[in-house]
Amino acid sequence: MSNASDHVDVLIIGAGPAGLTTANSFNGSNCRVRLIDWKPAPLETGRADGLKSISLEVLDSFGIGDRVLNDCQPCEEIVLWNPGKDGVIARTMTIPDKVEELGQIERVMVENLYRHKTVQVNWNTQPVRLHIAPVTKDEPEAHPLTITVQNKETLGQETIRAKYVVGADGAHSWLRKYLNIGFSGDVTDSTWGVMNLVPKTDFPDIRKVFVVHSRAGTVMGVPREDKLVRLYISMDGGNRHTSIDAKSITAENLLQAARAILAPYRLDAARIPWWSAYCVGQRVADEFARHNRIFLAGDAVHTHSPKAGQGMNTSIQDGYNIGWKLRYCLEQKASPALLSTYQTERRPIAQALIDFDRKYLESFTRRDITHQEFLEAYLAGQRFTTGIQIQYPPSLIVTAKHLHAPSHPLATNLAPGKRLPDFQMVNQSDAVPIQAYHRFTSDGRFRLLVFPGDISQALAFGRFSRLGDWLTSHLPPSSGLEIITIHGARRADVELMDLHPAFRPWSDEEGWNYWTVYADDDSYHKGHGHVYERCGISKEDGVLVLLRPDGYISLIASFDETHELIDFFDGLQSGPRTVPQPERRANL
């Protein structure tokens, strides 16, 4: 008979970006979570590049955004080199760029797990068997998944019983193969090498993001921390249809290929901490979930060329998506139908990623590409990897009202299914400015953002106070909903204690909460956030925005449509009243 200590709510397999993001989503919860990985320790130097703003916002919500940034190498421009008529490469284009190149993100995320002590982390551990017991939807406390894991050093085995399993175990996922889930797609005829090196070179743009097309092939360079540069090197000698066995490639082969492409500039390596070679695979898993109990994320469900940071950023979003949903189901006893939205939301994104990657890879391998074509491909890549164009389809957690309109009439720059943009707001109590995603910590809660307008005006203040009465009677603190007010008045014209207590809740242990009311106003040292303007909200009408724990918008309503909040949370507990829509392609 298993011990209680062998029972967990969630077992996460794999400590890469997807698995670590999923694990960090449980920090501060009472959930029993274990994370296992076959590696002996977290990677000291990450193997992914290009942290985008949307991923930084996720890390901000974990409280580690600033720490990750401290380890990053900021990049401000990308340069393109092409051969001239004489065949000699020359700089032909410079594009402003803004991206943070990663250093030790995985180490920082693991340290955050250790600090919170919510998730148990086991290294040198891999799964060897899985048994799935039959279970009905009426057994939320069941542990139907029995996983046998093995320590790689001692060969000792342990049996774990779990409610849910998340497989974030990479492109060669043990869990995906064990479940016999198809991995549709193909391996291209494009062979590339990748290496981290400390370069000794006279190439003038070595500390910028650069792409060099020459008659000998293509190389992309990305500056990193500690004097390192990441090079992506085409290994086909400029012939895109040459088949090369990646397993036969050595580090010296990579260096020789890079030298040929960068000629007449010289290139040597002071040291090479890491390198690899691969044939580009572009695949998407046929299923992202099985039985609503087992979920796959990250490279376990999508593989592609690693040249735009899209893989790591997409993997972080996968982990963030399934992490909050599992936590919400476990803590709030929500309908299991919530978990079904993971596949309907994330698989279309993965397919769009592969479709995009095919075009993006073409822009890096074509030597005859024009400046305009490369610029268009690059800008398309920026739009994709930032995630700002993603709009999730209607579901249990995205209301269909106004979904297909370009925006909501009361918030013309917001829409259900899209992510709330980050912005600066000023704390009403202490005048300290803060970015939204620094404040919106990852704690598994929905947030009702109340934009009451200019509450220094009697009409807006009265409407705001009536909303407070309604919230007190219909959505008490026990609902688990956090209410955040962002008003449009001058901060000096508002007194916190004049506001309805629903917006500054009282705790017998800690007194008033001074971190729930903010002003869209000038700060003393960091300017004005212009929140209402950026979101397209009228200070006369105001609006209510229901925000999911992952920062995407569930619902937008007027102050006269508060019943929609009741309907939303009723549905979240009982499940959808209609047949779910079939999966569709992502709206990007």
UniProtKB/Swiss-Prot annotation:
Pathway: Secondary metabolite biosynthesis. Disruption phenotype: Leads to complete abolishment of isoquinoline alkaloid production but accumulates a series of benzyl pyrroles, including fumipyrrole. It is an enzyme of class 1 (oxidoreductase). GO terms for molecular function: FAD binding; oxidoreductase activity; oxidoreductase activity, acting on paired donors, with incorporation or reduction of molecular oxygen, NAD(P)H as one donor, and incorporation of one atom of oxygen. Its cofactor is FAD. Its EC number is 1.14.13.-. Homodimer. Phenol 2-monooxygenase; part of the gene cluster that mediates the biosynthesis of the isoquinoline alkaloids fumisoquin A, fumisoquin B and fumisoquin C; as well as small amounts of fumipyrrole as a shunt metabolite. The products of the cluster lead to a brown coloration and are important for growth and conidiation. The nonribosomal peptide synthetase-like protein fsqF, which lacks a canonical condensation domain, is required for addition of a serine-derived dehydroalanine moiety to activated tyrosine but is not essential for the subsequent steps leading to isoquinoline formation. This is Phenol 2-monooxygenase fsqG. It comes from Aspergillus fumigatus (strain ATCC MYA-4609 / CBS 101355 / FGSC A1100 / Af293) (Neosartorya fumigata). The lineage of its organism: Eukaryota, Fungi, Dikarya, Ascomycota, Pezizomycotina. The gene is fsqG.
